[in-house]
Amino acid sequence: MLRSLVGSEMCIRDSMKTGYPIVYTSADSVFQIAASEEKVGLPRLYEMCEIARKILVGEHGVGRVIARPFVRKGDGFERTSNRRDYALEPSEHNVLVHLADAGVRVCGVGKISDIFHGSGICASVHTTGNTDGMQKTLDYMQTEPAGLIFTNLVDFDMKYGHRRDTLGYKNALEEFDAWLPKLYAQMTDEDILIVDADHGCDPTFKGTDHTREYIPILMYGKGLKQGTDLGTRPTFADIGKTVEEYLLGSCVDDEKAIGKSFLQDIM
């Protein structure tokens, strides 16, 4: 239920009565605005987030401003798939920009374009959840002969992780696992699949926040070595540099880059 994430039942009832939004923050540099789709409407909610984004820069900068629309459901309330993220533009060049500058197409599925403020993204499509995101990934594989398809399956985080819905999380994992053969069937000999995460959100842990644990790096491709143990990497950025080296043939010379490619370990 929404109230478990953004405050008390009274807070939401007051918002429904007055039309005022609910504003809250979290530890991972996020400023969030929640409002009723029926009472406030999506255009007004998005407008408020755009205003907040312009304010929350520099000394008061936060990584993302997030629009959190919700609707009534039974006796309570539920978030909808009309969330929007308004991110700071990346301060330095990133792998997506390097790829785009080299003419490599980068397609975002889900909130990827929002997270990177559109930086380096050539095409993007919104999704309504995991099932839709998986299908749109397959759709891009049909229409994009080469490049990077970058997909975010948001239900693991928003719908099940934060809500500590262990059964829902388990069912979502099984759905993803059952879907993978469809993805494998569309992969060419040159394609590489990387399954990872940007943080933990353990549905069995106390509270509702992200959880701290090492993320997985699961990779599959017909041209990869089998059973390679990559060990514990020093940074999440290693994945990005590996993608960059594979698609460009070499890593871009960038003295500020913190990632290190492990492509030679898997090819």
Q: Regions from the language model: what does each represent?
A:
Residues 209-249:
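Substrate-binding rim/cap in mid-to-C-terminal beta-strand-loop elements of soluble/periplasmic
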Residues 106-118, 144-159:
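A glycine-rich, aromatic-flanked flexible loop/lid motif
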Residues 99, 147-155, 180, 191-200, ...:
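Beta-strand elements within well-structured catalytic alpha/beta cores of enzymes
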Residues 134-141, 156-191, 204:
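A long, amphipathic alpha-helix that forms part
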Residues 249-267:
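Polar, surface-exposed loop/tail segments
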Residues 35-36, 43-110:
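Extended, H/D-rich, highly charged conserved domains that either
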Residues 1-7, 11-12:
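Single conserved hydrophobic/aromatic residue that forms the stacking wall/gate
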Residues 19-22, 63-65, 137-157:
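Active-site regions of oxyanion-processing enzymes, predominantly non-cytosolic
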